Every structure is written in structure tokens, then in C-alpha cells.
Amino acid sequence: QLTPLKVKLCVLKYPETTCRDMRKALYQDEVEFLVTHPVRLEIVSRMAARAKGNVLVLFNFVDKHGKPLYQRIQELAPERDVHFVSGEVDADDRERIRQWVANGDRQIIVASYGTFSTGINIPNLHTMIFASPSKSKIRVLQSIGRSLRLHESKTHATLIDVVDDLRIGVAVNHTFRHAEQRVQYYSMESFPYTMLELGLDRWLESLANASASLQHSKTKGEE
């Protein structure tokens, strides 16, 4: 038996001028642009700092994305223990971090997909954030499996999937297509999902508000 999962698709709509500039970007260039975007970094960091329970933030690139996320989340959540895990962290330290989280609450782990998508069992993981785009079905489902362990401290687990919308006209950006594929995975696995789409400024505004909640999301199919 597994913990029920609720998926929250948080769609970041970029300004029209940005979408136009990125319309013909190669996949690698688009990903580079997104993971180094300062406003995106701030939005994801605020999401992590405000998320409930023990939180796992997953990223792809250590130096240009993971470490800046870790630093900013520490600044935003000084009252919480924030841990960093990548291939640079040895197995003993990873195990110590796992035990801290397993025995605590309101812990935040900022970890690379490669080190945390498989092989680490933390039953009391409450919230997971996909901070980097990922199109691998196996990686997505393995990562989700980290949060589905049963634990008395949770009635469900929450996945925050950050979606980057650079669409303009008929042009659909690479990472948005990958997000559409992830939604197909969620549907196939019968994970209920909600969606909230806001411009970057609106995301910053909503997350800066002390009463802000990611629960304002619009349920799939609703107007």
C-alpha cells in the first residue's frame, strides 16, 4: 500500500518578448536559460521554503542550479534544516542526512536526480519539487516513488511540478512538451493533478504573501 499522491502543476508563463527570443532555441540552450534564470530560481526557492513537512527538491545541474537553490533556500528558511546532496557528497554523509530527515520534520533536502531518484528510502517525505525539467518516464516515476512510502505523519504526499511556458503562437518550447509528457504519466498512474498558471511577477507576488498557498490551484477541467 502506498500514500496517495497529489500533483500540483505550477506553470510559469514567461513574458512575450522572452518567448519570442527563445522560440528557436535548441533544447540545451533552453534548459541553460531556465536553470540560470534568477526569477525562476527565486520562485522555486520560495516554493521550497513554504512547503509543508519534509521537502525534497530535485535538480539536474549541481553548480549552476543545485548550489544556487541550496543557498537561496537557506536564506529564505533560516528556521529549517536545509541539506545538500549530490555526487560530491559521500555515502556516509548521505546516510546521515537521510537519518536526520527520517527522525525530524520540516527538513529540506536539495538533491540531484541522480543521487535521490533511486535507492534512498525516507518514509516521512511530505513534499517533492521537480525543480529541473525531466522527460525520462523512469526517472519521473522513480522520483515519485521516494514520496509514496507510507508514514503515520502524512495522509498524502504532494508533488510540485514546475512547468516553464515559453509558448508563442504555434511554437511550443521543448520543456513544455516534456511537461505534457509528464502529465500523461500522471494520468496513466491515476495521480490526480491541479494546475495553476501565472506570470513570473504574479508568482513572486503570491509567494511573498504570508497567506499565500499553492492550494489556490485550479482543478483540471474547471474554469
Residue locations for each model-derived region?
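Short, high-confidence coil segments that cap the C-terminus of an alpha-helix
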Residues: K52-G53, E79-R80, D105-R106, L125
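Conserved interdomain hinge at the start of the Helicase C-terminal
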Residues: D21-N60, K64-E75
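A conserved SF2-helicase RecA2
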Residues: Q1-P4, E16-T18, L141, R149-H216, ...
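Hydrophobic residues at beta-strand termini and immediately following loops
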Residues: C10, V85
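Short helix-loop-beta junction
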Residues: I73-R80, M188-F191
